[in-house]
Amino acid sequence: PWLMPIQDNLKFLMGDKTSLEMYMEKGKIEIEALTYIRGRSIANAFVVIDEAQNLTKHEIKTIITRIGDGTKIILTGDIEQIDNIYVNETSNGLAHAIESFKQYLIAGHVTFKKGERSELATLASKVL
């Protein structure tokens, strides 16, 4: 079940389920639970960490410190959509990474103003 949001988004971007399955079979796309990243060194890859607003500072550090040479990492998330009771808008891993790396040229931060799901989803994230 935890794979479904990622698979849904990749299927949308690729246009069909067959393309996603083909890339996964060829090892071009890997989807992995955070539990299995410990101890790894990920080199020459493009890593996307989705829903990073729900991660703790420790989890973000665990992920970023696995990044090897030639790898780019993207953290995505919306601090208005936190559903982890152990973090909030200021204590979550995404906010921590943004704040910690803002003075370094090796990192960048982009804030999108418009939600992608729907007007209702955007409103709900603000008012609920």
Question: Where are the model-predicted features located?
Answer:
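Conserved helicase motor core of SF1/SF2 NTP-dependent helicases
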Residues: P1-F46, N54-L128
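Walker B catalytic carboxylates
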Residues: D50
